[in-house]
Swiss-Prot record:
Its EC number is 2.7.7.89, 2.7.7.42. Involved in the regulation of glutamine synthetase GlnA, a key enzyme in the process to assimilate ammonia. When cellular nitrogen levels are high, the C-terminal adenylyl transferase (AT) inactivates GlnA by covalent transfer of an adenylyl group from ATP to specific tyrosine residue of GlnA, thus reducing its activity. Conversely, when nitrogen levels are low, the N-terminal adenylyl removase (AR) activates GlnA by removing the adenylyl group by phosphorolysis, increasing its activity. This is Bifunctional glutamine synthetase adenylyltransferase/adenylyl-removing enzyme. Residues 1-436 are annotated as: Adenylyl removase. One of its GO terms (cellular component) is cytosol. GO terms for molecular function: [glutamate-ammonia-ligase] adenylyltransferase activity; [glutamine synthetase]-adenylyl-L-tyrosine phosphorylase activity; ATP binding; magnesium ion binding. Pfam families: GlnD_UR_UTase (PF08335), GlnE (PF03710). Coiled coil: none annotated. Residues 443-937 are annotated as: Adenylyl transferase. Keywords: ATP-binding, Magnesium, Multifunctional enzyme, Nucleotide-binding, Nucleotidyltransferase, Transferase. It comes from the Bacteria. Its cofactor is Mg(2+). The lineage of its organism: Bacteria, Pseudomonadati, Pseudomonadota, Gammaproteobacteria, Lysobacterales. One of its GO terms (biological process) is regulation of glutamine family amino acid metabolic process.
Amino acid sequence: MSQPIPSASPALAALIERAVARVRHALPADAPWPEGVEHPLARVALASDFVVDTLARQPALLAHLAQPDPPPLPVPRLDPAQPQEWAAQLRRYRAAASARLVWRDVLGLDDVDATLAGATTLAETCLQCALQALEQQFSTRHGQVIAEDGSVQRLVVFGLGKLGGGELNFSSDVDLVYAYPQAGQSDGARPLAAEEYFARLGQQLARLLDETTADGFSHRVDLRLRPFGSAGRVALSFNGMDQYFQREGRDWERYAWLKARAVAGDIAAGEAWLETLRPFVYRRYLDFTALDGLRDMKAAITAEVAHHARLDDIKRGPGGIREIEFLAQSLQLIRGGREASLRERRLLPALQALVDLGQIDPPTGQALADAYRFLRRVENRLQMLRDAQTHALPQGEPERERIALGLGYAHWQALLEALAPHRTRVAAEFAELLAPRVHATAPDTLADYWRALPEGDAAPLLGIGLHDPNNAHHMLADFAQSSGVRALSDGARTRLDRVMPALLHAAIRATQPDAALRRVLGLLQATLRRTSYLALLDEQPSALARLVDVLSRSALLAERLAAYPLLLDELLDTRISGPLPDRAALHTACVDTLQIDDTEAALRELNERRLALSFRIALATLDGRQQPVDSTQQLAWLAEAVVQTVLQLARRELVAAHGQVPGGAFAIIGYGSLGGLELGFGSDLDLVFLYDHPREVEASDGKRPLEAGRWFARLAQKVMTLLGAETGAGRLYDIDVRLRPDGGKGALVSSLASYRDYQRDRAWTWEHQALVRARAVAGDAALCEAFVQVRRETLTRVRDPALLHEDVRKMRARMRSELDRSDAGRLDLKQGAGGLVDLEFLLQAGVLGQAAQHPALLLACATPALIDALVQVQWLPAESAAPLHHAHATLVEAGLSCTLDRRPRLVVSTPPIRDACQIVAAIADAQQLRFQPGKGA
């Protein structure tokens, strides 16, 4: 007697009893009944007639399943000499392997994720097994397809949908698309052109898997997702696929190919081709033009649910699996071009990536993941019952009882009560997705004015806040009849007509309305070719308002947005107002681009990330969410990470061409603002290059070796070239290497020994001053540490205080006379009296004079740290620390404010500025460093 199932009705208990008896009777007389198998078999019989049928047909399978942890079954070998047996072998294998999946699922050996993965692996195994046998058969009959370049061509089988995502349900069909890399002809006795060869091969593969025989079927095959659907060719070359997606590709196909994966045949070639398809699936910029197509798809889903009243369908019904998939994949399509983590085939990791990026809040993400797992588990059990491709909850009481008890619920109502909250939550989230547009509003007079342009006059612009309405009218009229506007499609022109009055209304309410309008028009002119940005402003009124606000307050950001519209994406990023990335996060964001093999593409991606991160820092500074001194430090960290990444790119290229110098080392030293962690927006980088290598090593070890010194010079030159190279996102940084030994007359790269000798014997005092702020920013750790030692040896030298102060004053006087742009009404924040350079010279003099006694001073490079260090050693009085910090912060803030609004760092000497400069000057005087008065003083 089998052990009864708790709560089972008498009829169900009898059904289970008969099922167990049927399996027992199917065993050969000499086959033992596995010990302890009766109870697990009864539980499985409750959940699946399919498993009972399979065990009745393959009774030897029971011993395999009765193991404590039944392993995968051996894959059948399809004998080329017996093709008539292939179908039966595949079907018996698929039935046995599927029975194992049910067994493990029902007995709790696998969770739903493992069951879905197992069903996927089974489908792939059958595909690969069948294709391998057919390829051998075709090769015998027709030979292999040979392309013009002599390469052998193989069929590529792409799996779409849940097969591609690795989430195949138990009794699912498989969505396949066939392709092949290149055209050609087979080389056998009965040759075929590649197109016919692979079409026949693909059709036979589908038939071998799909046809129902006395042994059932292996897998239902659906080929309708191929280009042109059922009317299209069975197999296309990669070139044909490319042409189709360039000319015919539609939004729903982007959605379908999001999960695509090469699952059989020439998998490597398939995955490589999918990389080329990525720009079709994921647009490079935030893709709000896709929203209309996605809304249409959502409306079709909603209409189908309403029309067919699919309340019991847990896949297509309200709150079902399809709604979760659509929710995740829609957000992936919109943002996946910018966020690599969203280019995920599997649904659950995609949901987590959306949570990590702030596109879904964590509770919602968890609720959707829980609902997805619950629904997929129920779906699998519905299909496991009789191996039927069903998604509908059963209507009959016996089936309901079996499903509920099999899932661990006492009765059907208990299962429904557990299911309902999941579906309700999913339906609510689906309803919110792609909600109807709420457009930005503007007075009707502005809408009428815009529609009338270029006709009409400036009258509607009078008295609404513009300082020069006539000039504004002329700008708007010129824009309205510009070639860019005239070239817009009807849809894009409709969007512009919706957006333009709202932009105009936002501009006139800005702090600088005329400047805001001028900058808005400049940005629109630059972005009209990319209608996705018009769609962004049309779809996101908050982004429109935010954009105009930023444009009105920052000429620099207005310029950058117009030059690099991808930065508009940052305005919509929910992380924009959150904590800024720390040093480690900045480093990770940059070095991740090294995963891109092509240097040009890696450089472009690196520059786009640098632009986005510096834009984020600029917004935080502009909004007052971060202190300017902290922003300059972050900009230096970002530059440091970029230099480290570029060095690796340069080294990668050089090693590939010439090998490496055995035992050699290279380091990049950051001077000036980079070294002092006080970099501005748009600052150049002061760099010095050092190298070292064993004396016995004379050259690199590649096929085209270079003399060691030349190799390092080539590396330094390549770093400079990459940092200054023009990409689609501009250049990374301008580089200044004049602080190297002997300046412009010296070698681009110095050996460690020559650098040490230069600093010891020939460097001027001002060069030692510069060394105070210098630090290693990239390169080999041992050489970076050796530089630290040279810096220590140089700066801890005992100096004559009087001579030191005289040298510092003379150099400051020279710089003042050559560089100070102050006049009677304005102060040069950097070079003026009491400005930032005076403060730097004060601190550098302190370090040079005190480091011999207090070497701990050398741990500091940044101005705030240097102030604290000099107070600590009592060179600066303790009471000067707070005033100096405040003065420094005031001057840095004023300087960044000028830079953000594209003004020279010449400011009217307001009381805060005047006080800051007086503090610096007074403390310098107290240290016998009375610097020459500034111009206009």
